[in-house]
């Protein structure tokens, strides 16, 4: 599986690869400079509150035919970033909001909310 990993430098520069973002819990915790238990807790809360669907945001990846691990999508990484309070998560949130604001050179952001009981979610 070709997967991209987000990096955040010490001075807050965010780099998102061109490959689809799929990151392990350890990679997410390294990017946001938190302990792995904080990432696990955030993921559990996001799934428990049905903010995101596990089927859409998590994949099982097998490496070298033996080691299996879970990876999470960009959507999950963004959701986690909004639950943390670190310098890196703030830099990432600012990066995401700047990208949303700069779409088509406009400063307006339109958010559409689905009020469905089965899969509540937000789309931009």
Regions found by a protein language model. Give the residues of each.
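Key DNA-contact positions within bacterial/archaeal DNA-binding proteins
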Residues: 37-41
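Short Lys/Arg-enriched helix C-cap and helix-to-coil transition segments
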Residues: 51-65
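DNA major-groove recognition helix of helix-turn-helix
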Residues: 43, 47
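Positively charged, aromatic-accented nucleic-acid-binding surfaces
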Residues: 1-27, 31-34, 61-124
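N-terminal start-of-chain detector that recognizes signal peptides
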Residues: 30-33, 50-54
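Short, charged/polar low-complexity linear motifs in solvent-exposed/disordered segments
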Residues: 48-49, 97
